[in-house]
């Protein structure tokens, strides 16, 4: 059936989306055995731009979900970074249980780091839970899912996956994607350069075609697809301009959303979500400079930060970390800067027995954390204090997987971006502003199971996994820290909750992989290949690096 005129396609060609009336007959729906859940991720989307576009009528498919369903502001992890946020979202627990905090994890008994992978997640994601229970599931483009793991359907890894192959299972499906010209990651983690608009559009078309084919099959009950290109473009050109490149890409994603809803069919609950938002920051705070100026970190005499060298970030960032550690006197550095994103930063004490060159006695940790927290709270720029919150990571991110986690996480005033820079300049101004992550993402949902609600709720990103399982009437784990949000249902029902250890179907990652070393070997081969291409240089300008942004701090959008 044709849609109302507001649903006609932009840019000169028309399309008819058989968008189901997602709320129709929902009151009578009581059988959950055949309902499906489609989760679409728009990486980096925030209501600051979504709401004006909805009001302008340029996102008709998303507007239908809003009018028939409900919305929630989705608070990201602290810090708001895609690796931690998406992993926590689909595992239902925070970084203290997943072990994923940033894009790198420390090597034991070393000051070096390595790029994370899907095996860095110590918590079972929903696709493993569902597959272990025999539920069909497709996963397409979710960050930090490489190496791909076998699921009861198709798994196509997203951000951090290599372009050459080894990113999808079954292998026959990967060959089909390669023949179509598909690339799993458009950012600069595995590539020398960012994609232009033409390249983005080409990949969107390929991804849309592949997803429409998958969703048109009847062998799945849950499908998750993330569109990372929005984050990649936002790191370059984010603005609130409704005619800007990010807004135009959102319009394209809305059209694709209509195609995917049509392919999924009428008995499908649809969730459109993001891992964080975006904004422009007119000022920066160099965390390394703060630590040096307050005598928490000491430099080796005569050393200077090395400048950035071109190459994939998967290698450039670890090289930069090694160069940075070489430039520090670790025997005298009591605290070290860790991940920074948006107006959030993190720090870690250099503890003996935990850090390879630690200088802080474990007995000193409580006292020094208190002093470091006070120094952060006392930090002033232009006569005004700029740190608004400081958290102990053990309280903010409880859990046993703490190898990659900091000791303190802090938040600054909204216009001050925290960076891990050269350590020379504490504070810099960027009149045009620099694009980076914001804390709050989006959740927009509608479907036959979901009751409409006009008031916007507040959720945590960890709520997504439990809520998806509850929509499918699947048992939840007692260990989940996220909420299942049963209040969104037309007919609320109590959740089925079991301890993880009492789920006889659940398999570990090694059991899922079947003991195969294929993916481990692929990772080793990939890193050797990149090194042989000369991408082993260092990167000194980490203060300007977002998750896919190679610009230097002084550059402005053209």
Residues of each region from the PLM?
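A long, amphipathic alpha-helix that forms part
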Residues: 30-33, 48-51, 197-223, 230-272, ...
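Long, internal low-complexity/basic segments
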Residues: 33, 399, 469, 474, ...
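Active-site-proximal alpha/beta segments of enzymes that process anionic O-linked groups
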Residues: 49-218, 231-232, 483-488
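Secreted, luminal/periplasmic, and some membrane-associated catalytic domains
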Residues: 42, 57, 81, 103-133, ...
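Bacterial signal peptide processing site
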Residues: 26-28
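C-terminal motif of bacterial Sec signal peptides marking the signal peptidase cleavage site
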Residues: 21-24
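Beta-strand elements within well-structured catalytic alpha/beta cores of enzymes
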Residues: 34-51, 64-65, 89, 130, ...
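Low-complexity, glycine/alanine/valine/leucine- and proline-rich hydrophobic stretches
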Residues: 415-465, 472
